[in-house]
Amino acid sequence: MITFRIATEKDILGIVSLFSQEGNAYNWSEERYKHFYQDYPLEGVVSFVAEFKDIIIGHYGILPVVIGNYKALFGVHAFINQKYRNLKVIRGLFQSLDNWCKDHQIDFICAVPNPDFSLVKSKFFGWKEIFNLGFMTKECFSFSEYHNRELFINYSEDMLLWRFGKVQDVYISKYFREGSWSYQVLYANDDVGLTYANSFGVADFQYWHPDAYFLERKKEFAQPFSIKIFNLEHEEFLTNPNNWFIQMGDSDAFVYTPLD
């Protein structure tokens, strides 16, 4: 029988083993797990697991985030053992998640899942894919006019230190793929104005930008942004893309690798 519950300290190695089954692209280890689920600066981190015969076969995590005055969460680290990857296991994990959110009067949970998982969540589990985050590549960036949007993740200095390892105004990360480097703007605070790539010694930047949010999926890859709303009083406002500003660094999928 598959059971669903909140993870404890004794589950860490089992969860790391689960995450490492398909190549461990994100270098999961006991230390990395503790970074997210024990060292996170805000209270209310939860790790949900599915277990079968004393083996962890599924996982979903939530991190509390500061978005306006809402009680908000960010969903992370969804993974199910390929042998058990079916709606029954996903449903059990999300039922645990939903019950916890209702018990704790959460307004909503948001996430940037992979496109396939986003479709599953939207079709079967009450999530809404409200827009897709398209990638822009340009020789400069400016987010100034979008920092007045009401829905964004607010980073304290403690959060910046936890996420990036140091506190500064802007974080440019280098990323190697398919034989070439790209330089990603993971985060810029509202004091950062128009910024040119050549000031960092690179040709161009890659980043998410509200001008590249789109409702319908296109041929080029984009990252879905999805949300599950528990306080329906705010549904209209929360599902309006024009109220959101999401940066690449909001997703833990983008690992910060400094230029120097």
State where each predicted segment sits.
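A short beta-loop-alpha structural element at the N-terminal edge
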Residues: 3-15
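Short beta-strand micro-motifs in enzyme catalytic cores
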Residues: 46-48, 71-73, 171, 224-228
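Conserved beta-strand in the GNAT
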Residues: 49, 55-64, 72-74, 79, ...
